[in-house]
């Protein structure tokens, strides 16, 4: 009998601008493999934090929406969610998925990474190789967080 519990693949919580986009992203992650996707259909900060904590998410992908008048899905609002998730789950990695065509948002994204509010971001479509890299980084954090049982 091993004293170490076998660790499941990373639990990846996904929250995009609409429930449909969230479901599609979770389905895509399921097909990609190497993780357990969790679709968070509400993008209210409290709901996202609650579900991440309840599911013990290892990684959170947050979609942004830079349309005029949609401030609750902009970089700062998504960073607010990231801060709250990390307050409860310090080892949870957070990445923003940003739509292409908004170069004016790049300084805010870079600053968020510099301040360690988020772990990174993707502009445009998230490709499988980038997601695998993020999953690999998450697995390394998970391994470091596992401590052997002291007898």
Sequence positions of predicted segments:
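Acidic, metal-coordinating helix/loop segments flanking the phosphotransfer/catalytic sites
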Residues: 41-59, 66-69
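A structural micro-motif
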Residues: 10, 35-37, 92, 119
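Short acidic, S/G/P-rich loop/turn micro-motifs used as interaction or catalytic elements
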Residues: 18-22, 65-71, 100-103, 127-128
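Conserved phosphotransfer cores of two-component systems
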Residues: 53-55, 84-91
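Conserved beta-strand segments of the P-loop GTPase G domain that flank and frequently precede/overlap
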Residues: 14-16, 60-65, 94-98, 122
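Non-catalytic signal-transmission and effector/linker regions of two-component phosphorelay proteins
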Residues: 1-31, 38, 127-151
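Alpha4 helix (beta4-alpha4-beta5 surface) of REC/receiver domains from two-component response regulators
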Residues: 73-76, 80, 93-122, 126
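Conserved N-terminal glycine/acidic-rich loop preference
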Residues: 3-8, 21-24, 56-60, 64, ...
């Amino acid at each position: 009998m091993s004293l170490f519990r076998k660790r499941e693949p990373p639990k990846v919580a996904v929250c995009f601008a609409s429930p449909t986009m969230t479901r599609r992203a979770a389905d895509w992650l399921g097909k990609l493999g190497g993780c357990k996707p969790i679709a968070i259909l509400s993008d209210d900060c409290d709901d996202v934090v609650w579900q991440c904590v309840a599911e013990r998410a290892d990684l959170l992908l947050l979609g942004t929406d830079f349309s005029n008048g949609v401030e609750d899905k902009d970089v700062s609002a998504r960073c607010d969610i990231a801060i709250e998730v990390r307050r409860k789950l310090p080892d949870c990695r957070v990445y923003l998925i940003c739509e292409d065509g908004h170069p004016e948002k790049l300084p805010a994204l870079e600053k968020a990474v510099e301040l360690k509010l988020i772990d990174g971001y993707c502009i445009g479509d998230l490709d499988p190789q980038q997601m695998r890299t993020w999953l690999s980084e998450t697995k390394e954090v998970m391994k470091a967080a596992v401590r052997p049982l002291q007898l």
